[in-house]
Design a protein with these regions (language model features):
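Phosphate/anion-contacting hairpin/loop surfaces
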Residues: 1-194
Length: 194
Protein backbone atom coordinates (compact mmCIF):
# COMPACT_ATOMS: atom_id res chain seq x y z
CA UNK A 1 0.00 0.00 0.00
CA UNK A 2 1.40 3.40 -0.92
CA UNK A 3 0.95 6.64 0.98
CA UNK A 4 1.98 10.24 0.41
CA UNK A 5 2.90 13.01 2.80
CA UNK A 6 0.57 15.97 2.54
CA UNK A 7 2.84 19.01 2.21
CA UNK A 8 1.36 22.47 2.75
CA UNK A 9 4.61 24.45 2.50
CA UNK A 10 3.95 27.20 -0.05
CA UNK A 11 4.57 30.89 -0.76
CA UNK A 12 1.27 32.10 0.69
CA UNK A 13 0.35 33.49 4.08
CA UNK A 14 2.20 31.90 6.99
CA UNK A 15 0.74 31.22 10.44
CA UNK A 16 3.11 30.99 13.40
CA UNK A 17 0.92 30.98 16.54
CA UNK A 18 -1.82 28.70 17.82
CA UNK A 19 -5.19 30.39 18.30
CA UNK A 20 -5.73 31.92 21.74
CA UNK A 21 -8.67 30.75 23.80
CA UNK A 22 -8.66 27.15 22.64
CA UNK A 23 -6.85 23.95 23.58
CA UNK A 24 -3.14 24.18 24.38
CA UNK A 25 -0.94 23.97 21.28
CA UNK A 26 0.53 20.53 21.96
CA UNK A 27 -2.97 19.04 22.06
CA UNK A 28 -3.40 19.70 18.33
CA UNK A 29 -0.51 17.27 17.76
CA UNK A 30 -2.15 14.31 19.46
CA UNK A 31 -4.75 12.14 17.73
CA UNK A 32 -7.70 13.16 19.88
CA UNK A 33 -11.00 14.95 19.36
CA UNK A 34 -11.01 18.58 20.47
CA UNK A 35 -14.37 19.85 19.17
CA UNK A 36 -16.17 19.44 22.51
CA UNK A 37 -13.84 21.93 24.20
CA UNK A 38 -13.37 24.21 21.20
CA UNK A 39 -15.36 27.48 21.20
CA UNK A 40 -18.48 27.06 19.05
CA UNK A 41 -17.92 30.38 17.28
CA UNK A 42 -14.38 29.43 16.36
CA UNK A 43 -11.10 31.17 17.08
CA UNK A 44 -8.85 33.65 15.27
CA UNK A 45 -5.44 33.03 13.74
CA UNK A 46 -3.25 35.77 12.28
CA UNK A 47 -0.69 35.97 9.51
CA UNK A 48 2.86 35.99 10.86
CA UNK A 49 4.23 39.52 11.38
CA UNK A 50 7.67 38.13 10.54
CA UNK A 51 6.61 37.60 6.92
CA UNK A 52 4.66 40.75 5.93
CA UNK A 53 4.92 40.04 2.18
CA UNK A 54 3.25 36.65 2.47
CA UNK A 55 -0.42 37.51 2.04
CA UNK A 56 -1.80 35.11 -0.56
CA UNK A 57 -4.43 32.72 0.75
CA UNK A 58 -4.45 29.14 -0.56
CA UNK A 59 -6.75 26.23 0.29
CA UNK A 60 -3.90 24.88 2.43
CA UNK A 61 -2.31 27.61 4.57
CA UNK A 62 1.38 27.32 5.42
CA UNK A 63 2.17 27.01 9.11
CA UNK A 64 5.23 26.40 11.27
CA UNK A 65 2.96 24.76 13.84
CA UNK A 66 2.75 21.24 12.37
CA UNK A 67 -1.03 21.55 12.07
CA UNK A 68 -3.07 21.80 8.88
CA UNK A 69 -5.15 24.95 8.31
CA UNK A 70 -7.50 24.41 5.38
CA UNK A 71 -10.34 26.03 3.47
CA UNK A 72 -13.94 24.91 3.44
CA UNK A 73 -13.26 23.33 0.02
CA UNK A 74 -10.75 20.96 1.64
CA UNK A 75 -13.17 20.22 4.48
CA UNK A 76 -15.89 19.25 2.02
CA UNK A 77 -13.64 16.81 0.13
CA UNK A 78 -12.33 15.14 3.29
CA UNK A 79 -15.71 14.89 5.01
CA UNK A 80 -17.25 13.33 1.93
CA UNK A 81 -14.47 10.79 1.46
CA UNK A 82 -13.29 9.89 4.95
CA UNK A 83 -15.38 11.65 7.63
CA UNK A 84 -14.06 9.75 10.66
CA UNK A 85 -10.39 10.52 10.05
CA UNK A 86 -10.46 14.24 10.94
CA UNK A 87 -12.53 16.94 12.59
CA UNK A 88 -12.61 20.55 11.46
CA UNK A 89 -12.28 23.35 14.01
CA UNK A 90 -13.35 26.77 12.63
CA UNK A 91 -10.91 29.67 12.47
CA UNK A 92 -11.14 33.22 11.22
CA UNK A 93 -7.97 34.35 9.49
CA UNK A 94 -6.72 37.91 9.93
CA UNK A 95 -3.93 39.63 8.05
CA UNK A 96 -0.93 41.53 9.40
CA UNK A 97 -3.12 44.56 10.24
CA UNK A 98 -5.66 42.32 12.05
CA UNK A 99 -8.24 42.76 9.27
CA UNK A 100 -10.40 39.70 8.60
CA UNK A 101 -9.45 38.03 5.31
CA UNK A 102 -11.42 34.77 5.61
CA UNK A 103 -14.02 33.18 7.87
CA UNK A 104 -14.30 29.83 6.11
CA UNK A 105 -11.08 28.14 7.25
CA UNK A 106 -10.49 25.32 9.70
CA UNK A 107 -7.83 23.55 11.69
CA UNK A 108 -7.95 20.06 10.21
CA UNK A 109 -7.48 18.07 13.40
CA UNK A 110 -6.41 14.63 12.19
CA UNK A 111 -7.89 12.04 14.54
CA UNK A 112 -6.76 8.85 12.84
CA UNK A 113 -3.28 7.42 13.21
CA UNK A 114 -1.60 4.41 11.67
CA UNK A 115 1.52 2.40 12.39
CA UNK A 116 3.07 2.50 8.90
CA UNK A 117 6.74 3.43 9.47
CA UNK A 118 9.37 0.70 9.48
CA UNK A 119 11.74 2.08 12.11
CA UNK A 120 14.32 -0.67 11.57
CA UNK A 121 14.75 0.07 7.86
CA UNK A 122 14.34 3.86 8.10
CA UNK A 123 17.24 6.22 8.68
CA UNK A 124 15.85 8.52 11.35
CA UNK A 125 16.77 10.20 14.62
CA UNK A 126 14.37 9.76 17.49
CA UNK A 127 13.45 12.73 19.68
CA UNK A 128 15.28 13.16 22.98
CA UNK A 129 12.13 14.56 24.59
CA UNK A 130 9.39 12.44 23.03
CA UNK A 131 11.15 9.09 22.89
CA UNK A 132 8.65 7.46 20.50
CA UNK A 133 8.64 10.39 18.04
CA UNK A 134 11.03 10.93 15.12
CA UNK A 135 12.84 14.28 15.18
CA UNK A 136 14.81 13.98 11.92
CA UNK A 137 14.35 11.93 8.76
CA UNK A 138 17.12 11.04 6.32
CA UNK A 139 15.25 8.19 4.63
CA UNK A 140 11.79 7.02 5.58
CA UNK A 141 10.75 3.44 4.89
CA UNK A 142 7.20 2.19 5.22
CA UNK A 143 6.22 -1.25 6.39
CA UNK A 144 5.63 -3.73 3.60
CA UNK A 145 2.62 -5.46 5.14
CA UNK A 146 0.25 -2.53 5.75
CA UNK A 147 -3.35 -3.73 5.54
CA UNK A 148 -5.41 -1.90 2.88
CA UNK A 149 -8.30 -1.21 5.25
CA UNK A 150 -7.85 1.55 7.78
CA UNK A 151 -7.75 5.34 7.77
CA UNK A 152 -7.20 7.08 4.45
CA UNK A 153 -5.98 10.33 6.05
CA UNK A 154 -3.91 9.95 9.21
CA UNK A 155 -0.98 10.88 11.40
CA UNK A 156 1.80 8.34 10.98
CA UNK A 157 2.77 6.90 14.34
CA UNK A 158 6.22 8.28 15.31
CA UNK A 159 5.73 11.37 13.05
CA UNK A 160 2.79 12.99 14.78
CA UNK A 161 3.23 16.44 13.25
CA UNK A 162 2.76 15.09 9.74
CA UNK A 163 -0.22 13.94 7.71
CA UNK A 164 -0.26 11.04 5.27
CA UNK A 165 -2.95 10.20 2.73
CA UNK A 166 -3.74 7.16 0.65
CA UNK A 167 -4.09 7.34 -3.16
CA UNK A 168 -7.88 7.89 -3.04
CA UNK A 169 -7.58 10.99 -0.85
CA UNK A 170 -4.66 12.30 -2.91
CA UNK A 171 -6.66 11.82 -6.12
CA UNK A 172 -9.73 13.55 -4.67
CA UNK A 173 -7.74 16.56 -3.44
CA UNK A 174 -5.92 16.79 -6.77
CA UNK A 175 -9.13 16.47 -8.81
CA UNK A 176 -10.70 19.27 -6.74
CA UNK A 177 -7.80 21.52 -7.85
CA UNK A 178 -7.07 22.64 -4.32
CA UNK A 179 -4.24 25.13 -3.96
CA UNK A 180 -1.20 25.32 -1.68
CA UNK A 181 -0.62 21.58 -1.38
CA UNK A 182 1.65 18.99 -2.91
CA UNK A 183 2.14 15.31 -2.22
CA UNK A 184 5.48 13.64 -1.56
CA UNK A 185 5.88 9.84 -1.73
CA UNK A 186 6.23 8.72 1.90
CA UNK A 187 8.31 5.63 1.15
CA UNK A 188 11.87 6.85 0.60
CA UNK A 189 11.13 10.41 1.76
CA UNK A 190 14.33 12.27 2.70
CA UNK A 191 12.81 14.68 5.21
CA UNK A 192 12.79 17.63 2.80
CA UNK A 193 9.85 19.42 1.22
CA UNK A 194 11.49 20.27 -2.08
Amino acid sequence: MSFSLLCDKNDGALLDAYPEGGPEGWRYLVSQRLAAEYPSGGLTMGFSPNFPDRRKLYDFVDSILEIRIVSDRVRQVIQELTPRDAEFLPVTLVDHQKDVVARDYFIMNVIADRDVIDLERSTVRMSHLLKDNISRVSELKLKEDIPPDGPKLFRPRHLRGYTMVDPTVQAALTTAKLTGVKFLPANGWNGKYR
